[in-house]
Amino acid sequence: MSRIMATIVKPVEQKTKHLDYFLSQCHRRRYPAKSTIIYAGDKSDSLFYIVKGSVTVIIEDDDGREMIMAYLNAGDFFGEMGLFDNMDSRSAWVKAKTECEVAEISYTKFREIAQQDPRVLYFIGEQM
């Protein structure tokens, strides 16, 4: 029985360790419900992690109508498209659906910590 528990507990401990390290490198901010966290068209230079709360990802169609693309919750990332696609500007608005605590890290800092410990990339990849 202890072997089974070890195979469960060890990966959880590793994930917690990587998350704690990742969050220690981030700037945390709180946003009231319905406030805008990201504006479409803004410079794309940061990755965000939802520590607490939920957000809505919104785009505009060709007629200017808002379309909800996703609801994201604690444990989810957003703002990653610019990290992987080299996009210069944000393609969507992200608004706090509820009161939120969000951790933000610049793409530059994220790449630095990923070079120092590539296992962080695997942790992040599992979350996306």
Task: List the model feature ranges, each with a label.
Residues 70-126:
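Cyclic-nucleotide recognition modules
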Residues 34, 45-58, 73-75:
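Glycine- and acidic-residue-biased ligand/ion/polar-headgroup-sensing regions
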Residues 55-67:
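A short beta-strand-loop-beta hairpin characteristic of the jelly-roll/cupin
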Residues 26, 44-45:
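Short loop/turn microsegments at loop-to-beta-strand junctions
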Residues 1-35, 72, 78, 82-86, ...:
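Cyclic nucleotide-binding regulatory module and flanking cytosolic helices
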Residues 30, 48-49, 95:
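Well-ordered beta-strand positions
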Residues 37-42:
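Short phosphate-coordinating micro-motif centered on Lys-Gly-acidic
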